[in-house]
Amino acid sequence: MDIKKLVRKNILQLVPYQSARSIGGNGDVWLNANEFPISSCLSLINISLNRYPEFQPKKLLNAYAFYLGICSEKILVTRGSDEAIELLIKTFCEPRKDKIMYFPPTYDMYDISAKILNVESIGIPLLKSFQLDLNLIFRNICGVKLIYLCNPNNPTGNLIKKQDIIALLTYTKGKALIVVDEAYIEFCAMHSIVQLIEKYSNLVVLRTLSKAFSLAGLRCGFLLSNSNIIKMLSKVINPYPISLPVSDLATQSLSKKNIDIMNSRVLDLNKTRVWFVKQLRTMYCINTIFDSVANYFLVKFHDSKLVFKELWENKVIVRDQNKKTNLKNCIRISVGTRLECFEVIRILERIDRLYKNVRR
């Protein structure tokens, strides 16, 4: 039997997301997935697993609501932000009729989730400054139900101007939802727009424990919006989305003690990023290092294929961005421990000596 005859046409044509782990590599230093370099110290309490979990764990909802300073009715717990991205399309978009919009170069799952669900996606490239092209957005917004933007943006590391997000919210009121993915916001927490949920009924914010909380392996995220949107999404989400072990560890991570630990680690990592970038700025093999407020930064090399190959062969795994919109010769580097950063510097210095000799 030819199984392709049974598969939906749009799935046959789909180019799947390449996760950091699926790409492979025999790495000792993993700087390709924007994970926090230090593991969490949480451990499971004694829980029974013979009963199904709550649909939405009350303790976890209350803990996250307290952390953000909003009411729990405005929160939906999801299996990472990826489930929330897909859930919004399932709930609000009619296949082959409605559209979503996103702004490349950015996180690929906005586009891929739409394609899986047979919903048209419109990619409006960011400007050279990696900011929104509002004029082009407004000219192409007809039929768009969901607009996804990542802030700070992945892979560029910059913040989208708050006034531009507000302009989008105002222009699309009553027509579309603006979905702001704040996966990396703890690294620049003062720039969150969560509090705008009270003012704008078409705002949805996505958050996660995968990055600053050092819980990428847990798969726990949060969708924040007004209670009417939460109620609609609750009709569509799976009946038991959050397992008891996930709920337990996620709730523990939101205790005052563990939030203090997270904030302290974020402060240290931000200092490491500044130091790391400073070490790289004078290298001949580098064209540009783009400013970042997240736990990663984007580097444009003169020859990114050579750099990627050298790092790979030395078991340092980074993320090639050459196929992304307007990112030729670019590599995204996650900020690791100081020792991991030193290893990157050591390899790049060796490459740099070749460039110095050529320039002479």
From Swiss-Prot:
Its cofactor is pyridoxal 5'-phosphate. One of its GO terms (biological process) is L-histidine biosynthetic process. SUPFAM superfamilies: PLP-dependent transferases. PROSITE patterns: AA_TRANSFER_CLASS_2. It holds the Pfam family Aminotran_1_2. Its EC number is 2.6.1.9. It catalyses: L-histidinol phosphate + 2-oxoglutarate = 3-(imidazol-4-yl)-2-oxopropyl phosphate + L-glutamate. GO terms for molecular function: histidinol-phosphate transaminase activity; pyridoxal phosphate binding. CDD domains: AAT_like (cd00609). The keyword Transferase applies. The keyword rRNA-binding does not apply. Keywords: Amino-acid biosynthesis, Aminotransferase, Histidine biosynthesis, Pyridoxal phosphate, Transferase. InterPro entries: Aminotrans_II_pyridoxalP_BS (IPR001917), Aminotransferase_I/II_large (IPR004839), HisP_aminotrans (IPR005861), PyrdxlP-dep_Trfase (IPR015424), PyrdxlP-dep_Trfase_major (IPR015421), PyrdxlP-dep_Trfase_small (IPR015422). The modification N6-(pyridoxal phosphate)lysine is found at K211. Pathway: Amino-acid biosynthesis; L-histidine biosynthesis; L-histidine from 5-phospho-alpha-D-ribose 1-diphosphate: step 7/9. Homodimer. HAMAP family: HisC_aminotrans_2. Belongs to the class-II pyridoxal-phosphate-dependent aminotransferase family. Histidinol-phosphate aminotransferase subfamily. This is Histidinol-phosphate aminotransferase.
